[in-house]
Amino acid sequence: QQYTSTVITRYFNYCINERKHPDHGIIGGYLFYDRIIKNYLAAYLSVLQETHYPVSLSDFYFHGRHFSEKQLPVFSYISDCILAHNIWKQSEETRKLYEYYNLSTALGETYKILTICDNPLLYILAIADTLEPIKAYEKINPKTVSESINIEYMPGSRKLTFSSSNNAVDISELHRRAKGLEGWTSAHCTEITGGAFTLCL
């Protein structure tokens, strides 16, 4: 677990009070866990209605799908990653506010840098959310963005190379975001060379 429930609650309050909107990542994380547990219980109740023998809540099948209590920690882990990937590391501008809301684990000197080895899913969510081209170029037509940005991956290399195939989309904006990852993840970004840059994961 990247953050305690107390820190998550404090950050949520910080977002509502200071950023003037609830954090969608925190809401999404809690909703994911809530819905998937309800789905688990609904499947179990349906099995009870359809069968005439005892069924264990900890391990059962419903419509060919296996439900097991061993899946619950996985659900919890996924939920935690969704929650945590949207909790931002403190910047110089937000330091006093973070201290006010007692967000000690998100302060610069105590923040735990995200790595792919320590927490693969959280790391991938952080990278994908930061470098999502449609979000990065929200003022440009999504179709134009999708047709302009090229992302190359060499299997086994942990490297992504980004480039733009035309002048409609300036690759420097995506590069700026990629460089920003260096402050809170273990990712390393090269400079732009020949209209392309590489992100080392």
Q: Could you say what each language-model-derived stretch is?
A:
Residues 1-152:
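Divalent metal-dependent catalytic cores for phosphoryl transfer on phosphate-bearing substrates
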Residues 128-131, 135-201:
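C-terminal effector/catalytic modules and regulatory tails appended to multi-domain proteins
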